[in-house]
């Protein structure tokens, strides 16, 4: 079978890692084409057999007519390659493929990687959902709550496939004395609400001033977050080191991980921390990814969104009760073994075959 995957770009990120992993898996027994909207090499290693295309000859796009150029180029590439099925990922690529669906006449699976209520948050986007999403032959979502957002017609075409955990992170929990560091990993953007985490840490620091907070990642809020850190006088305790390679080695011995997001799909950073056996705290945010991963007080702690006091209380609990911290860390590591890549990729493969077979019978 010839399978085409289409996404925005293959930079460092959770969705991109999942796409690369899936493309490599599918390429073992299929001809695979990976196409990006924006020009750029893949951050993740791809099998040499995989063909790679970019729809635009630029690395940044903000102009509306870029979409028109992309649609024209997508049409040409698809007609030239004649894939048996197309998988698209993320909002803009999904829109491109849905617009072209009727003229391409290729079975299409679209994947929604985040909270649908945040994606379809304007009148125009809701119209897109109403009139275009029903064109897809299949829809992949990450949680039950995400699936329930859609109408019955779309739900019947849908399947829930969680993210696979990166196998580099599947380790036995660290048994020694942990470093007095609290870690968070994610883009420095409004969705991740690192400002709430900083506020929670400020509360914790008043009682436990020997701990440090390390927030890995880059993004548009870096300067604003640094200003906040400076304003509260914690620039010696809170650091923003940016992106680092082999982060699993950096954070393995840290005392805890905290995810402060206001919404998520299936958060890779939380999955990876739990797989490493790091005691983990997350907001119980829509669309249910953290709740899918964490059984509260059994393998992690769930707290309310945007509640710095509850978050600080959870952080203190892990600091104060080492027996509890070790208990949730061990259970977290066991939970994430259920999401190893081979199992998840097999679910993808079966759904691809199901949609392809249905279309071939028509």
What are these regions (language model features)?
Residues 5-21, 25-66, 151, 221:
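N-terminal strand-loop element at the rim of the active site
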Residues 16-21, 95, 180, 184-206, ...:
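A conserved mid-protein helix/loop that constitutes part of the nucleotide-sugar donor-binding site
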Residues 39, 88-94, 112:
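Short His-centered aromatic/hydrophobic patch
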Residues 145, 164:
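Carbohydrate-associated surface elements
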Residues 226, 237, 310, 317, ...:
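A short, well-ordered alpha-helix in the C-terminal region of glycosyltransferases
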Residues 243, 262:
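Aromatic "clamp/platform" in nucleotide-sugar-dependent glycosyltransferases that forms part
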Residues 279-284:
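Short hydrophobic beta-strand element within catalytic cores of glycosyltransferases
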Residues 295-297, 301-308, 317-322:
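Conserved acidic donor-binding segment of nucleotide-sugar-dependent glycosyltransferases
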């Amino acid at each position: 079978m010839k399978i085409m995957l289409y996404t925005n770009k293959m930079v460092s990120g959770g969705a991109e890692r999942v796409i690369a992993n899936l493309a490599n898996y599918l390429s073992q027994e299929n001809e695979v084409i990976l196409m990006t909207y924006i020009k750029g090499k893949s951050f993740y290693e791809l099998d040499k057999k995989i063909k790679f295309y970019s729809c635009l000859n630029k690395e940044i796009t903000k102009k509306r007519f870029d979409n028109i150029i992309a649609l024209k180029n997508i049409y040409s590439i698809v007609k030239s390659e004649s894939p048996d099925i197309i998988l698209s990922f993320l909002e803009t690529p999904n829109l491109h493929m849905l617009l072209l669906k009727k003229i391409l006449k290729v079975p299409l699976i679209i994947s929604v990687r985040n909270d649908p209520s945040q994606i379809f948050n304007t009148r125009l986007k809701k119209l897109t959902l109403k009139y275009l999403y029903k064109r897809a032959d299949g829809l992949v979502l990450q949680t039950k709550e995400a699936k329930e957002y859609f109408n019955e017609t779309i739900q019947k075409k849908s399947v829930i496939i969680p993210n696979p955990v990166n196998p580099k992170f599947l380790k036995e929990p660290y048994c020694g004395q942990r470093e007095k560091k609290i870690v968070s990993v994610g883009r420095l953007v409004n969705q991740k609400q690192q400002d709430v985490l900083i506020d929670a840490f400020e509360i914790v620091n008043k009682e436990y001033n020997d701990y440090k907070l390390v927030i890995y990642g880059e993004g548009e809020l870096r300067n604003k977050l640094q200003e906040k850190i400076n304003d509260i006088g914690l620039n010696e305790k809170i650091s923003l080191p940016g992106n680092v390679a082999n982060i699993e080695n950096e954070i393995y011995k840290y005392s805890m991980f905290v995810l402060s997001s206001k919404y998520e799909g299936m958060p890779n950073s939380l999955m990876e921390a739990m797989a490493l056996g790091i005691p983990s705290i997350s907001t119980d945010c829509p669309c249910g990814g953290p709740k899918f991963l964490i059984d509260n007080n059994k393998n992690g702690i769930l707290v309310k969104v945007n509640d710095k006091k509850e978050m600080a209380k959870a952080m203190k609990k892990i600091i104060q009760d080492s027996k509890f911290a070790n208990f949730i860390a061990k259970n977290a590591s066991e939970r994430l073994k259920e999401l190893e890549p081979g199992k998840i990729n097999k679910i993808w493969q079966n759904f691809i075959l199901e949609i392809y077979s249905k279309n071939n019978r028509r």
